[in-house]
Design a protein with these regions (language model features):
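Conserved alpha-helical substructure of the radical SAM core
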Residues: 2-137
């Protein structure tokens, strides 16, 4: 019988009941693009009839992102995780590498990552993402 080891990183974790109320959030999910270039049957983002009434498909402006990073800087302690995706495909935002670079340069965010379908990675474009300052890029192959 094989013993499986958890892939969760448990080192440095806090028991929330001992640290509440929090002085700042541990993590924030931002959506640089609330649209997607795929229409996966299992994902609500690809179903126009499901999402029409719930959210507007759009691309976040760089100035809006700058404002958010500025506000994150006002927290009394650094943010542990910034996830640069939620509903949409983040690479649809052409400013994504620069956004990640700005977040990294703020020195107020410990870990930055995003998940992507990878369809927009090619040539020099992928170099921009690899040099952006992201700790991890998750490519979802569905």
């Amino acid at each position: 019988m094989a013993i499986e080891k958890s892939k969760l990183r448990l080192d440095g974790r806090h028991n929330l009941e001992k640290v509440l109320p929090l002085a700042a959030p541990y993590s924030i999910y931002l959506d640089p693009a609330s649209a997607c270039n795929f229409k996966c049957s299992f994902c609500p983002t690809g179903h126009q009839e499901l999402v029409t009434g719930f959210y507007k498909r759009s691309i976040m402006s760089f100035s809006m992102f700058e404002n958010i990073i500025s506000q994150i800087g006002m927290f009394p302690c650094p943010l542990k995780v910034l996830r640069m995706n939620k509903i949409g495909e983040p690479t649809l935002n052409s400013c994504l590498p620069e956004m990640i670079g700005l977040a990294r340069a703020s020195e107020r965010i410990e870990w930055i990552d995003f998940a992507t379908n990878g369809s927009r990675f090619s040539g020099d474009n992928i170099e921009r993402f690899l040099r952006s300052g992201a700790n991890r890029i998750n490519i979802s192959l569905e």
